């Protein structure tokens, strides 16, 4: 299962850890994904992986 938000497509980002000596090593920052149950119009429920920021936006706009 991919580490992506179902609605926004938000995925992992790549950056650098920079030490005091200016040595750089790669790091990945993963999105804050939550598994959410969504009820569809026909009454069935589906589990989706959604970013926490997307959940906040959904609550704000609903």
Curated annotation (Swiss-Prot):
UniProt keyword Ribosomal protein, yes or no: yes
Segments crossing the lipid bilayer: none
Gene Ontology cellular-component annotations: ribonucleoprotein complex; ribosome
Key words of the record: Ribonucleoprotein, Ribosomal protein
Keyword Metal-binding among record annotations: no
InterPro entries: Bacterial_rp_bL28 (IPR050096), Ribosomal_bL28 (IPR026569), Ribosomal_bL28/bL31-like_sf (IPR034704), Ribosomal_bL28_bact-type (IPR001383), Ribosomal_bL28_sf (IPR037147)
Annotated GO MF terms: structural constituent of ribosome
Lineage: superkingdom: Bacteria
Alphabetical GO biological process terms: translation
Similarity comment text for this entry: Belongs to the bacterial ribosomal protein bL28 family.
Protein name: Large ribosomal subunit protein bL28
């Amino acid at each position: 299962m991919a580490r992506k938000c179902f609605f926004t497509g938000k995925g992992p980002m790549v950056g650098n850890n920079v030490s005091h000596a200016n040595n750089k090593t790669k790091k990945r920052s993963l999105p804050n994904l939550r598994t959410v149950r969504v009820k569809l119009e026909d009454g069935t429920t589906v589990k989706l992986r959604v970013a926490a920021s997307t959940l906040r936006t959904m609550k704000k706009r609903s």
